[in-house]
């Protein structure tokens, strides 16, 4: 819907507003739709490609431009670029209902894709499709929000699904390869690493060989512990972030 500006200014259409309240005053900038998130993520770095008008407003819909006195009082500067930067990074995006729903759908789809990629059925060793993940989360009354990264929400969803088990589900194991130098001097380290990694016969070398290597599966929750153990003493290579069974059965 167009926003009417005072005579002499262009009419703005397809506007996304970013609003920041400071010192009991409201400041707004007018942006192109879908450009704000790109700017915040660093995908778009040119403000001129984001802003419809390179100006700070008190009220965009009424065309009220912020004066220098208010900028100085509230932001400590009259530099419009500095004020715009702060509003862009700290302000709240004012979304229409349609924009909000589109963004929510995008976050939800991204979250479901992550959960599907990281989890498996412990019996079949196969992934669940996003549609089944979505249904399970609906039963658990888990709903995504637009102001939190999809990856973080995916991890929260996984934790809930694994704890409630309304469908049989576990985090898929990671496949890693560890190499430790001078293993004969570090038998305790080798033992600790071996307990974390589930390896098949032949996937680890003898402790007297230098370097000692071990390839196998590890629970993702133990990955940080493994990295800590190997810090400055060896290397950890991730061969597969989520091991699944790709075989088909007739």
Curated annotation (Swiss-Prot):
InterPro entries: Ribosome_mat_SBDS_CS, Ribosome_mat_SBDS_N_sf, Sdo1/SBDS, Sdo1/SBDS-like, SDO1/SBDS_C, SDO1/SBDS_central, Sdo1/SBDS_central_sf, SDO1/SBDS_N. GO terms for biological process: cytosolic ribosome assembly. Changing residue 31 to W: Impairs protein folding and stability. Loss of function. It holds the Pfam family SBDS_domain_II. Keywords: Cytoplasm, Nucleus, Ribosome biogenesis. GO terms for molecular function: 5.8S rRNA binding; guanyl-nucleotide exchange factor activity; large ribosomal subunit rRNA binding; rRNA primary transcript binding; small ribosomal subunit rRNA binding. Disulfide bonds: none annotated. Its main location: cytoplasm. One of its GO terms (cellular component) is nucleus. It is found in: Cytoplasm; Nucleus. Involved in the biogenesis of the 60S ribosomal subunit and translational activation of ribosomes. Together with the EF-2-like GTPase RIA1, may trigger the GTP-dependent release of TIF6 from 60S pre-ribosomes in the cytoplasm, thereby activating ribosomes for translation competence by allowing 80S ribosome assembly and facilitating TIF6 recycling to the nucleus, where it is required for 60S rRNA processing and nuclear export. Present with 5060 molecules/cell in log phase SD medium. Associates with the 60S ribosomal subunit. Belongs to the SDO1/SBDS family. This is Ribosome maturation protein SDO1. It comes from Saccharomyces cerevisiae (strain ATCC 204508 / S288c) (Baker's yeast).
């Amino acid at each position: 819907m167009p926003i009417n500006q005072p005579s002499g200014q262009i009419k703005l259409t397809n506007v996304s507003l970013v609003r920041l309240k400071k010192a009991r005053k409201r400041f707004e900038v007018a942006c192109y739709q879908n450009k704000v998130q790109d700017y915040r993520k660093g995908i778009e770095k040119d403000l001129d490609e984001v802003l419809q008008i390179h100006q700070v407003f008190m009220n965009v819909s009424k065309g009220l431009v912020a004066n220098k006195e208010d900028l100085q009082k509230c932001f400590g500067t009259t530099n419009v670029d500095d004020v715009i930067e702060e509003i862009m990074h700290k302000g709240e995006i004012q979304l229409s209902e349609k924009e909000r729903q589109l963004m929510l759908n995008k976050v939800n789809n991204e979250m479901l894709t992550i959960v599907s990629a990281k989890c498996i059925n412990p019996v079949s060793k196969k992934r669940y499709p996003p549609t089944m993940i979505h249904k399970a989360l609906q039963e658990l009354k888990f709903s995504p929000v637009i102001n939190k990264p999809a990856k973080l929400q995916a991890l929260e969803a996984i934790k809930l699904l694994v704890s409630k088990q309304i469908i049989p589900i576990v985090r898929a194991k990671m496949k890693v390869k560890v190499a430790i130098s001078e293993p004969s001097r570090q038998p305790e380290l080798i033992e600790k690493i071996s307990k974390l990694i589930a390896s098949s016969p032949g996937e680890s070398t003898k402790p007297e060989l230098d370097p000692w290597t071990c390839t196998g599966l590890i629970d993702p929750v133990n990955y940080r512990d493994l990295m800590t153990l190997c810090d400055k003493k060896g290397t950890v290579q991730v061969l597969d972030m989520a091991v699944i069974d790709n075989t088909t059965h007739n």
